[in-house]
Amino acid sequence: MKRSQRMNNSPERHSQYRNEPHYNTYYQPVGKPPKKKKNKRIFLRLFIIFVFIYALFIGLMYYLSSRANVDDLKTIENKSSYVSADNMPDYVKGAFISMEDERFYKHHGFDVKGTTRALFSTIGDRDVQGGSTITQQTVKNYYYDNERSFTRKLKELFVAHKVEQQYSKNEILSFYLNNIYYGSDQYTIESAANYYFGTTVNKNSDSMSQITVLQSAILASKVNAPSVYDISNMSDNFKNRIKTNLEKMKQQEYISDSQYQEALSQLNNY
């Protein structure tokens, strides 16, 4: 076949006669940016917008929390059974710290890791899953109801930061221990110790026997579900929770190994 005949029979020649576009398979079209770069620019813009809105929202919440009046927390000290954390044995404070907020003495009102987990859980499940420090729980118990929402969690977080700026750690711990529900209409740790064990958390008191390590661990383990965990008829789940608490107290050096072993032995009698 002659060269002219081959040219006439080629697809390119036929496409020209039919007014069809001829596509160059050797070169990329000029003037159109690659899709990947375009997608990156869109993502970057969306990210900048998100960061701006987030920063604006956080700034507004921080401003509002800075105006919050947390002086009212001092009224907790007016309770007749109030006992300051300064007057409690270290293992009493340790029982609650090791169970509820291991980093209590290190953070400034909220724990970044725990709070981030809780906030993302809130967004995904429409619910709040843990993450609250002792300071946040103190704020929630005093200022807010049991509403579970993203907005309430943020308010709690920033007011907790204000509380940390205004009060010492022992003051905050005192507020917490004297304003949580222990079950059976008991709202201070002293009244709970009196009611359940006939003991006192005040290490300077001679009127009653001092609360034991095990009793402290029981109360600290109970506040998570005070209406469910029954001290007079302990479930296996409750006992396991108490054992976990005692282990944490030993690991964090709030109690010695001998105190730990003694408490475990006493727990078997329940």
From Swiss-Prot:
Give the UniProt record's GO annotations in the biological process aspect. Answer: cell wall organization; peptidoglycan biosynthetic process; regulation of cell shape
Record protein name field: Monofunctional glycosyltransferase
Q: Where is the composition biased (Basic and acidic residues)?
A: 11-21
Molecular function GO labels: peptidoglycan glycosyltransferase activity
Predominant place of localization: membrane
Spell out the residue ranges making up region: Disordered: 1-36
Organism field: Staphylococcus haemolyticus (strain JCSC1435)
Q: Which GO terms describe its cellular component?
A: outer membrane-bounded periplasmic space; plasma membrane
